Amino acid sequence: MAAPCVSYGGAVSYRLLLWGRGSLARKQGLWKTAAPELQTNVRSQILRLRHTAFVIPKKNVPTSKRETYTEDFIKKQIEEFNIGKRHLANMMGEDPETFTQEDIDRAIAYLFPSGLFEKRARPVMKHPEQIFPRQRAIQWGEDGRPFHYLFYTGKQSYYSLMHDVYGMLLNLEKHQSHLQAKSLLPEKTVTRDVIGSRWLIKEELEEMLVEKLSDLDYMQFIRLLEKLLTSQCGAAEEEFVQRFRRSVTLESKKQLIEPVQYDEQGMAFSKSEGKRKTAKAEAIVYKHGSGRIKVNGIDYQLYFPITQDREQLMFPFHFVDRLGKHDVTCTVSGGGRSAQAGAIRLAMAKALCSFVTEDEVEWMRQAGLLTTDPRVRERKKPGQEGARRKFTWKKR
């Protein structure tokens, strides 16, 4: 029984082998005929993918192109703002002609109350010129060429301005060398008073030029203007420099000066108050005296044993060169010795303003004698040893 089984299995395996060879040959023939067509199709698909992969739009990717606003768009927004302003004035029962931006802000805060802490997230109604940023006009012609020769620097207005300032400096140096050759150069240099004005800050300069500047660009521009201002420039150059300065209101004009009072004997005095931390002081400075200072009825040298605290009290008189010319009576309460000395110094400096000139008041303000110290003791934090100090860390 074993031999027929072997022969039958061999016949079956032989038939399977012949069928497999035939099917493989047929497949190879079909592959040879279809291979060129498949290769061309695959190549075309690869090329198609290669050329179309870059034009597939990406989702949820913000565009880096800056949004532009046309003049017609801005005009339309201004018209809508004026119409909304009239409606808002009528709703609030106000006159639309005298309805200012402060009234608009007050009305918006009343009609749309918001508890958001971030003020920029609250509803606003501003003029379109404040909402939409300023933009440049078209900088190139119909042929695609830019109008300005510094267009490809990326900051044409900035570099054009730097070129103008440097050209002025070269002209001034040339003029000075010409005068020096003829011995006509003046010996005295003219000093220009720049008190009461400041340079444009970086954001203001960017708004003027409608360009983004780095900190280095801003510093180089200010340094060049300062060099031009310190040189012997004329009226035209000085007027050019003033375009980049803004006037500042002097604090001395806002400083409240205590009026001079008179006691029963007819002696003039001035009274003022001061505070530092939790200490509060009141000082009476007499117009004439020998330099005696009493604190709570005690001489200041006995009340303040530390030399540093005594120097704090004497500094306002030393600053305006009036040591030994005024008598002072002070009362102070609260705080420690250092805080009490600071409160008394502030009170005496404010009272002393009644007997000095306006220029000396401004000098005292710039020295910080008329400014209240806002610093207070920082609170202890939970989980810490102090306000800033942490507990000692131990591994075990």
Curated annotation (Swiss-Prot):
PTM sites of type N6-acetyllysine: 287
Predominant subcellular localization, coarse grouping: mitochondrion
SUPFAM superfamilies: Ribosomal protein S5 domain 2-like (SSF54211)
Region (Disordered): 374-396
Gene3D superfamilies: 3.30.230.10
GO MF annotations, alphabetized: RNA binding; structural constituent of ribosome
PROSITE patterns assigned to the protein according to its UniProt record, in alphabetical order: RIBOSOMAL_S9
Any one GO biological process: mitochondrial translation
Quaternary structure and interacting proteins, as annotated: Component of the mitochondrial small ribosomal subunit (mt-SSU). Mature mammalian 55S mitochondrial ribosomes consist of a small (28S) and a large (39S) subunit. The 28S small subunit contains a 12S ribosomal RNA (12S mt-rRNA) and 30 different proteins. The 39S large subunit contains a 16S rRNA (16S mt-rRNA), a copy of mitochondrial valine transfer RNA (mt-tRNA(Val)), which plays an integral structural role, and 52 different proteins.
The protein, known as: Small ribosomal subunit protein uS9m
Lineage: Eukaryota, Metazoa, Chordata, Craniata, Vertebrata
Gene that specifies this protein: MRPS9
